[in-house]
């Protein structure tokens, strides 16, 4: 087909000539293209164009309401977890209050709703025998402050509720934990406001 893929390369600019995108600037080098497609965040893609070619201003983007971001925790346990399904929703707090904290008055929710996923319940290859892999997701407003201290505070909040609802202690059985949040969505995926 004559297609050439450039991987692990950050695009610095979309080069437009005569109202047509004709090349990309990658690592200071111009790479010609017949067609340019972007699967990146719309805002980020626009920032790769010269300002006079952008369809929307920064003011436009600042006023938009975006889909939620999230705080994700990837967790490994050295035991099997009881009283959960592969997909488990913890909607034991007020949905309207959490939604308000995402869309109307963006801030960290006091009592967040969260989702827990235990892939090792249905695919044993995702954790060693007798252990469990999981991830937890808290929907958040995009663009809010993101610090390690806030992440830890919210991990403890959801673990308190998780242990209470499922009737078991699990924190002492955590052998791996990693988080991914607003800052990471921005830096990894160029997601506007994370």
Predicted features and spans:
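FAD-binding beta-loop-beta segment adjacent to the flavin cofactor pocket
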Residues: 14, 123-131, 183-194
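Residues within well-ordered alpha helices
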Residues: 1, 161-162
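Active-site/ligand-binding neighborhood in enzyme catalytic cores
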Residues: 1, 8, 191-194
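A glycine-rich dinucleotide-binding beta-alpha-beta segment and adjacent secondary-structure elements
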Residues: 109-115, 168-194
């Amino acid at each position: 087909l004559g297609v050439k893929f450039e991987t692990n390369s950050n695009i610095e600019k979309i080069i437009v000539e005569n109202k047509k995108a004709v090349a990309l600037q990658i690592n200071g080098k111009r790479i010609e293209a017949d067609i340019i497609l972007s699967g990146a965040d719309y805002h980020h893609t626009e920032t790769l164009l010269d300002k006079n070619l952008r369809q929307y201003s920064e003011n436009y983007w600042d006023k938009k309401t975006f889909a939620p971001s999230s705080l994700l925790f990837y967790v490994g346990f050295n035991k099997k977890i009881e009283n959960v399904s592969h997909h488990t929703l913890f909607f034991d707090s007020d949905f309207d209050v959490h939604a308000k904290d995402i869309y109307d008055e963006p801030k960290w929710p006091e009592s967040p709703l969260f989702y827990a996923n235990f892939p090792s319940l249905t695919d044993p290859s995702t954790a060693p025998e007798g252990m469990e892999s999981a991830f937890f997701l808290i929907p958040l407003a995009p663009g809010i402050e993101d610090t390690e201290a806030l992440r830890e505070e919210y991990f403890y909040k959801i673990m308190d509720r998780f242990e209470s609802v499922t009737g078991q202690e699990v924190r002492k059985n955590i052998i791996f934990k990693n988080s991914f949040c607003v800052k990471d969505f921005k830096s990894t995926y160029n997601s506007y406001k994370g």
